[in-house]
């Protein structure tokens, strides 16, 4: 298997275009109820769009995520993204973490440190793991399936 290094590098143009689209969002009329029973409340959606345009720092997030070892490998014609973090602890066991739908490796970001370097978190080194977290086909930085039949059994 040919493992290739991977770094997240979203072009500035794409971030600019996303901010333009978010700024141009046509919000629906105010809902008739003050809860989520009819979907996402207009005020929440407006606040979320504003946050992504004015406050969210993609480059900080990208830098943080790039501190995690990532790579790509090709299987059945599709590039599969993965995260791999090895432990320095003797006797560490490999641990495969898989996300569900919808999801991504980000679900595991906060536990990778304690799993791979438990001593830094005041935990016993006996729980140390080498973490491998593939991104499912069609999710995140993995390629999209190019044919039919990509069901749970095939992906597993």
In which residue ranges do the predicted regions lie?
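N-terminal targeting or regulatory segments adjacent to alpha/beta-hydrolase or S9 domains
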Residues: 1-64
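Catalytic cores of eukaryotic secretory-pathway lumenal/extracellular enzymes that build
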Residues: 6, 24, 46-156
């Amino acid at each position: 298997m040919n493992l290739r290094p991977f770094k997240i590098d979203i072009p500035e143009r794409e971030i600019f275009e996303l901010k333009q689209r978010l700024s141009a969002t046509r919000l629906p009329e105010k809902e008739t109820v003050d809860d989520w029973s009819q979907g996402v409340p207009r005020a929440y959606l407006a606040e979320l769009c504003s946050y992504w345009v004015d406050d969210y720092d993609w480059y900080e997030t990208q830098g943080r995520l790039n501190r995690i070892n990532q790579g790509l490998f090709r299987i059945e014609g599709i590039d599969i993204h993965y995260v791999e973090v090895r432990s320095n602890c003797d006797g560490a066991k490999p641990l495969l973490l898989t996300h569900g739908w919808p999801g991504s490796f980000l679900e595991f970001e906060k536990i990778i440190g304690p799993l791979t370097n438990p001593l830094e978190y005041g935990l016993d080194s006996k729980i140390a793991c080498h973490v491998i977290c593939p991104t499912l086909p069609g999710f995140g930085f993995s390629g999209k399936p190019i044919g039919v039949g990509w069901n749970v059994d095939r992906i597993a």
